[in-house]
Each structure stands twice: as structure tokens, then as C-alpha cells.
Amino acid sequence: MVLSRLDFPSDFIFGSGTSASQVEGAALEDGKTSTAFEGFLTRMSGNDLSKGVEGYYKYKEDVQLMVQTGLDAYRFSISWSRLIPGGKGPVNPKGLQYYNNFIDELIKNGIQPHVTLLHFDIPDTLMTAYNGLKGQEFVEDFTAFADVCFKEFGDRVLYWTTVNEANNFASLTLDEGNFMPSTEPYIRGHNIILAHASAVKLYREKYKKTQNGFIGLNLYASWYFPETDDEQDSIAAQRAIDFTIGWIMQPLIYGEYPETLKKQVGERLPTFTKEESTFVKNSFDFIGVNCYVGTAVKDDPDSCNSKNKTIITDMSAKLSPKGELGGAYMKGLLEYFKRDYGNPPIYIQENGYWTPRELGVNDASRIEYHTASLASMHDAMKNGANVKGYFQWSFLDLLEVFKYSYGLYHVDLEDPTRERRPKASANWYAEFLKGCATSNGNAKVETPL
């Protein structure tokens, strides 16, 4: 298939993105406090987070690179611990100034800001006070944080995402990235859903009329398919969908968890009161989707009997991530949202391909990956999927959980200047966004997941 930007609707948004903890650096400067996610990134990447890639100081340079690339929009997150260092209470003037300056710089240069409120980085003060997501206080504190953001930035920011990868955030630990045990992921997920709905209610009641913005939630969403033609693998694939996507989406659409979760998890799964069910239903204007790979699923009926229960043992399935995305995977995922959830507006908020850092700027495999992804997404859109935008991940090489890079622009973390250099993929994306055609078959790439 040969595609250009001209094959997409005129109002379709093309962008790229990063997150605060992975791009800003200045980890404990100008009043900012620590977060568990930043400690996790430091351990897993082996890099010094305090300097990072220096987005905090190089934001004007980075915005000019966005202009050169031709981005419509840029997705980034606001560091809760930079804006409100105590997690609650006084706003940090220097943090407020930084985000105001950054947003103004984007808009001055014709780049639309898309803001994520929470990208895994809960302030350590709140983790210490009530173990973060496990405490019901999280709902109140997150809503107060969102209120500050809406008040201070909402006159210029029209697109808000409450929580990044709500399902992964609920289920994964920040020690070695393992799955949370027993009841923990379900309690965390429950509180995330309630906190999200609370922030949406606040925005709609207090700010929507004057700011006219849109607000949604983000999910990590692989497309799960049976590993074999065996009927049990097909049933297991649907369970995997229910345990990852349906876990969050069904409450937002129907006010209830999927029947699969109720059956498999039993009393360990929290329940919504009648009032909460009404509260969370329809609490979004769009859904953000982070999609990287397809995942083959094999039935594993014995795993649910494990004494060491996790979300994976509960779903009674073995998952095998696959890197081929040029075929049906993104298409299948988007058509699932269309079929099962009433075709909500979707933004692909992360779609990226890892390469070893030492590869430098020669990343032809990334071009192949993104070309295939765009073709798969375009196929879904031709079939009626309501996709509104596509954000490549990531704009720059960042601090990542694995020692790989996803960026359009190379950043050498050993170079004290943190120089940005365009990769082949940056030049490709810029040409695509100018309307030049790109074509690709069914790309096959490897994945570290």
C-alpha cells in the first residue's frame, strides 16, 4: 500500500510524544521532588536520571525540531512532583513557570499541546503516605492536582489525558516491572477509574464551558489473537482482551467490570456501587491507545490454580508478544473498539519501535515499522474506525525501561551536551508529513517485550 498524509482526513492530527520523567531531567532541581517511577527508570536503564535528556533546559530547541519535522501536535506529561512537590498543597512557582513557558512556546510555533496528567510518576510523598494507588485518598489528591492543571493551563490546552496506560499502571510494580500480586492490581485499577472519572466530572462542571476542551483516558492495548486454531486458545484470547482492555473500558461504557473478570477473580475484584457505576459511565470524550505489538495467546487452564496469583494467572493464558504490526494487529484492535465499544474517538497516543542505542541515526527498521503501522491504521479507518490522531513514540531518545531507544532524534546519554541528531526516521516522518508517499508490505520486527 502506498500512503501519504493526504490519504488521511484534513483534520487528522499527526504528532509525537514524550513523558516528563523520561525527557525533562532536572530531577531534583527548582523544587521538584522524587518519584518511584524515576527510581525505576534509573535502575532499569542504568542512566543518570538527574540529567536525563535535559528537556527541562532544551525545550525551545526541541520545539524548533518539532517545527522542522512538521508535527501538528506534541504529547507530553506534567510532572506532579514538579508542579506540586508535596503531592498536595502549595504549587511550585518554578514548576508552574516552566510548564507555562513550554506550552506558550509550543503554541507560538503552531504545535498543539496534548497533555497527560499522570504518566506513572506519583510523588514519593503520596506513596509514603498511603501507598499511592492503593489508597482511596489518591482519588481526592489526583482530582486536586488535575484542578490546578485545568486552571493554570486549560486556556491553552484543549486535549487532556488523565492517566497513561491505566491498565499497565495498575498491574505492574515499580521494582523490576513484575506483575502485582493477588488483589493489588484490581484495587489500583479501581482507584484509577474513580480518579479518572472524578477529574472528568470536575472538568466538565467547572471548565468545559469556558475552555471547550476534551478529556480522556489512555490504555496499553495489544491486539490479542489465538496462537493456534484450537477453540480454547480463541476463548483464552478473548479472556486476555477482557483482562487488559475490557478491565478498564467496560466500566467506562457499561459501568461494570467484564463478566470474565468477575468469574475468574471472584471476591478479589472490587465492585462499583450504583452511584459509582453511573459516575464512571461515559466519563471520556476520547480514548488514548498505546499500541506496539500483537500478542499470541495460548490457553493455560492450570495457571489459575497458582498460589501466587497475578493478573496473568487469573486470565489463565500464556502471552507471546509478536512484533509484526503491518498486518491485522492495529487494524484488529481498532475494529474491536468500533465493534464492542460503540466506535469511540481514538487517538493512537504511542506507537513505536525500539532499536539498540548504539545503532545511532541509521534506523531503517523504525521506518519500516511505522510505515506498516500507518497502513494498518488506515485500513481500519477505511472500515469505519473512528481514529482522530497518531502520535509516534518517541520524539527524542529517552530514558527507557529497557536499554533501547525509540526516538526520531538521537540523544547520546554519554554526551554532556545531550546533542539532538535527526535519525533517518525523523527525515522520513518529515517527508511523510509534507505529503510524500510511503509504502510498505507486512513488516516484521522484533520486540523486547
From Swiss-Prot:
Pathway it works in: Secondary metabolite biosynthesis; terpenoid biosynthesis
Binding-site residues for a beta-D-glucoside, renumbered to this chain: Q22, H119, N164, E165, Y292, E350, W393, Y406
Keywords, sorted A to Z: Cytoplasm, Glycosyltransferase, Transferase
EC number: 2.4.1.-
Active-site positions on this chain: E165, E350
Keyword Glycoprotein: no
Gene3D superfamilies the record matches: Glycosidases
GO molecular function annotation: beta-glucosidase activity; hydrolase activity, acting on glycosyl bonds
Pfam families on file: Glyco_hydro_1
One GO BP: triterpenoid biosynthetic process
Protein's cellular compartments: Cytoplasm
InterPro entries, alphabetized: Glyco_hydro_1, Glycoside_hydrolase_SF
One GO CC term, this protein: cytoplasm
Expression (tissue specificity): Mainly expressed in flowers, flower buds and young leaves, and, to a lesser extent, in old leaves, stems and roots.
Biotechnology comment: Soapwort saponins possess anticancer properties and are also being explored as enhancers for endosomal escape in targeted tumor therapies. They may also serve as precursors for vaccine adjuvants.
SUPFAM superfamilies cross-referenced by the UniProt entry: (Trans)glycosidases
Family: Belongs to the glycosyl hydrolase 1 family.
Role of this protein: Component of the oleanane-type triterpene saponins (e.g. saponarioside A and saponarioside B) biosynthetic pathway, leading to the production of natural products with detergent properties used as traditional sources of soap.
Protein name: Glycosyl hydrolase-like protein 1
